[in-house]
């Protein structure tokens, strides 16, 4: 028999969460229908206004500023990662990974060579670096920097590393399954457990086999770090295939959200959240809103949401970079995955997904979902985290990880600053390169980077201006 959340005993916060969530879903549906009816006329008007505004501003800017503006617009309008990389003179090889449970993941190999050369394995056997994105994202977030000097991926390619970008099941590049269609409920029946059990280890095995290497360096951002922690904790042999885990804005057990009402909503029982959002993709209309709204308005809406949910100001990210980044920020994932994160916030522990069949807090003293045994990880871990990041509880993270973890704090950085701030080239890329040099012999033709010598363990020395 199906249990409906409104006939269960709920706390008053959960009744409020149910009411607000129901109101939000209905309001968003009505607004979507209205917007769809006027999309062809008003949407085109919005975009023409923005284009004219960009043209006017570009005439008033200096030549260098105008080039940045044109580059920002080109990246903003790029349809996929291949177009985005081509703007900066890089090329993309697409590779398909079949997971053990039959999802087809599209991953990308970034190169400065022409697309005609598909060198697998690479004749020089370059050190392999595998980068993985965060929640509700895809591989594009790594290459949408307006200033290419702030792009970690491009810098690694320039330094002679064999760079691969992963994608989670369900996102823009990984919506295929051998038995299910993306419109099927079964396709979206996955959580962080499945990323850890299948996506990460199967992708790593493919990359190592294709590159001819026995080990790689894993660089994760946000949920990409949590997936690695979880996967390494439940796959002991995977630890022998990763020489170092570099975690940018690492996430294991966020404290919660800045807005108390929304925080109560997200910590509600899964039955409530599934009742409101269904059991497929979370907010499938987000792509429509992005295409409908003027870029500046879409940027303002997202900035407001980030401020309300996480208390982020995005002060370290330029206005151009924010417009570009937000255009490539969202990608699909399952409602179940988001529910899993809400369960982690609710328990304040990095646990496996809980189906919540028992339904009441009373039973929690008899039953809890298993914790990921992250203390068992043998791979060397290097954390780079922001002092103003509301999603990072560094002490809780250090308690959950092995004692040998090294970490670097960037004082004023928020979560998204780790990949998009104007000073990534000063405060993120140098410690990453230093860590890689500690692991590998310098690749052929690598230039000395004086910046790395200014990096000290657990500290980054400011250059010219404080962080």
Curated annotation (Swiss-Prot):
Domain AB hydrolase-1 residues, every copy: 127-421
Gene Ontology cellular component annotations, sorted alphabetically: cytoplasm; membrane
Enzyme class: hydrolase
Cytoplasmic side: 1-17
Modified residue annotations for Phosphoserine: 66
EC number(s) given by UniProt: 3.1.1.-
Keyword set includes Transport: no
Localization per record: Cytoplasm; Membrane
Topological domains annotated Lumenal: 39-467
Annotated catalytic residues: 222 (nucleophile), 389 (charge relay system), 415 (charge relay system)
Function: Probable lipase.
Protein name as it appears in the record: Probable lipase C1672.09
Protein source organism: Schizosaccharomyces pombe (strain 972 / ATCC 24843) (Fission yeast)
